[in-house]
């Protein structure tokens, strides 16, 4: 595999800009955008392996469960019969058509796979070493992350992490007590703890792999054209006028600064205005709580002024 055809992995915590980053990096015809193979609810036509947990951890010891499926995915081998058997709604049918065409076009045009998958974040070393992925990790301010989850009322069941012995052993054992103690209804507390764990692990990964690209969502939002141009250059992608236009349209001040909770995956927003939304949504006591809970990790990415 030549360097230019290495797959790209865009990951980071969910609700941290991975969709926007992935879509913008796949804005031209060089790449094929594939969404969340490690989502527990992934489509069987796209990825054949069963995913048991949110934030499934993959390493050398359990790779036999996933490696063949990922090789098929990166070969753009679409399992049409599996997908047909799983169709239960018109939405499923339309999604099958979309995914089939992504795989077909990738094969016909020799495209490079771009995997957008927040749930791969703990497994980044495996993706880099076994699948030769170029890595992009997005970060979003912890208060913005918590505010987004609270607004959507998306809680997180830490049993998905606690029930993974390899993940606990390798990265998260020191957080066992905090995960066990968090209340099921405490979305803010869950978000702060999850953010601290994810980006504490990411920081260790980055220290060992300085070539990986770790980007703040806020930096992309403040200067999208230039920041994405830099990412394109680092990944060996062509930053064409068409790409620039798509990025400008996705982040324009003419777009809304706030979206309906029903538009959870929209990528057209006023990017500059949207980074400030958490300051309007969260009361001061919740901001202070998030800051305290993420202390020790948040300072690695955000200065004190970023909390004001």
Task: List where the protein language model places each region.
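Short catalytic/ligand-binding loop motif for oxyanion handling, primarily in non-cytosolic enzymes
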Residues: 22, 40-43, 121-124, 143-148, ...
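A conserved segment at the C-terminal end of the G1
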Residues: 19-31
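Hydrophobic/aromatic beta-strand patches that form the interior of the parallel beta-sheet core
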Residues: 8, 32, 134-137, 213-215
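PAPS-dependent sulfation machinery
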Residues: 34-115, 158-184, 271
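Conserved phosphate-donor/acceptor-positioning beta-strand/loop module used by diverse small-molecule
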Residues: 116-117, 130-151
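PAPS-dependent sulfotransferases, especially Golgi type II membrane carbohydrate sulfotransferases
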Residues: 1-9, 14, 152, 159, ...
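Short His-Asn-centered micro-motif
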Residues: 11-12, 115-118, 139-140, 217
């Amino acid at each position: 595999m030549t360097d230019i055809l290495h797959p790209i992995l865009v990951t980071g915590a969910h609700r941290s800009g991975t969709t926007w980053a992935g879509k913008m990096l796949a804005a031209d015809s060089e790449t094929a955008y594939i969404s969340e193979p490690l989502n527990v609810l992934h489509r069987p036509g796209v990825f054949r392996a069963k995913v048991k947990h949110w934030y499934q951890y993959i390493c050398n010891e359990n790779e036999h469960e996933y490696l063949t499926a990922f090789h098929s995915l990166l070969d753009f081998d679409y399992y049409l019969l599996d997908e047909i058997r799983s169709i239960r709604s018109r939405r499923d049918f339309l999604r099958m058509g979309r995914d089939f065409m992504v795989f077909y076009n990738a094969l016909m045009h020799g495209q490079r796979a771009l995997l957008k998958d927040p749930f791969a974040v703990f497994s980044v070393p495996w993706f880099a070493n076994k699948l030769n992925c170029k890595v992009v990790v997005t970060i979003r301010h912890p208060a913005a992350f918590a505010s987004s989850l609270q607004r959507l009322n998306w809680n997180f069941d830490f049993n998905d992490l606690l029930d993974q012995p390899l993940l606990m052993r390798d990265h998260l054992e020191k957080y066992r007590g905090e995960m066990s103690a968090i209340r099921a209804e405490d979305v803010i507390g869950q978000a702060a703890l999850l953010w601290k764990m994810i980006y504490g692990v990411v920081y260790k990964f980055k220290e060992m792999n300085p070539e990986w690209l770790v980007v703040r969502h806020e930096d992309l939002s403040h200067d999208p054209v230039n920041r994405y141009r830099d990412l394109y250059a680092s990944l060996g992608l062509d930053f064409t006028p068409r790409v620039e236009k798509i990025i400008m349209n996705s982040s324009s001040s003419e777009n809304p600064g706030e979206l309906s909770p029903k538009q959870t995956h929209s990528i057209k927003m006023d990017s500059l205005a949207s980074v400030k939304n958490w300051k309007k949504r969260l009361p001061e006591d919740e901001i202070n709580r998030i800051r305290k809970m993420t202390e020790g990790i948040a300072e690695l990415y955000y200065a004190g002024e970023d909390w004001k």
